[in-house]
Amino acid sequence: DSHRRQRQMCIRDRTSTLQQAASSKLGFGVSRTMRVAQKLYEAGRITYMRTDAPSLSNDSIEDARLFIKDTLAEEYLTEKPRIYSGKENAQEAHEAIRPTSASLTPEKLSGHSEEEVKLYDLIWRQFIACQMPDAKYLSINAKVVLDDYVFSARGREVIFDGYTKISSQNAKKADEENLPSLEEGQVLKLVEVKNEKKFTKPPARFSEAALVKE
């Protein structure tokens, strides 16, 4: 059983979403994220880091699109520029948090601490990915019959990686695995059987990222 799906890039970086991403992906607390972002801003590497706006300037959008076209391929560029707008009452004196130059990749960032490079990498990838197309894949639910036993597997087959080529955001759910192409009635070779004991877990405690989201 399979069906096609698309996964979209999430909205551009605002202060709250940057704090959430830095907490979940880098283990940074809110105050640490803002301290590191302040250093990047003062060094002229990123735009102002206190903003409610997901919007981007036309020049920055063109900058990202030129980078994608020159360094990746035409297929990784959306047909039209993606424009992001904020909520009606959002404070949009500043645009979304982004690098000041798309061509300044994390690998080229010099004279900065490890934590600054890590946060910059997060911001840069989010910025570039926002002008890339959706990821496309087949969602697969497979049942494998072995004698009197039926084994189930849930996963996906990637058709086109899209924005996930540069950003792992929303690339795969925790219970999904990349599966090879399968056909109904196909004979498979048993390689290994593992018996694993698993337990359900209580809801996780609130992290700083979860509190910011709330």
PLM regions and their residue ranges:
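Active-site phosphate-binding and catalytic loops of NTP-dependent enzymes
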Residues: 30, 74-81, 128-136
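Short amphipathic alpha-helical interaction segments
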Residues: 28-39
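Long, charged, helix-prone linker segments
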Residues: 137-155
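TRNA-recognition modules of translation machinery and tRNA-sensing kinases, especially anticodon-binding
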Residues: 118-125, 139
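Extended, highly charged linker/hinge segments and catalytic-adjacent loops that couple domains
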Residues: 43-121, 152-195
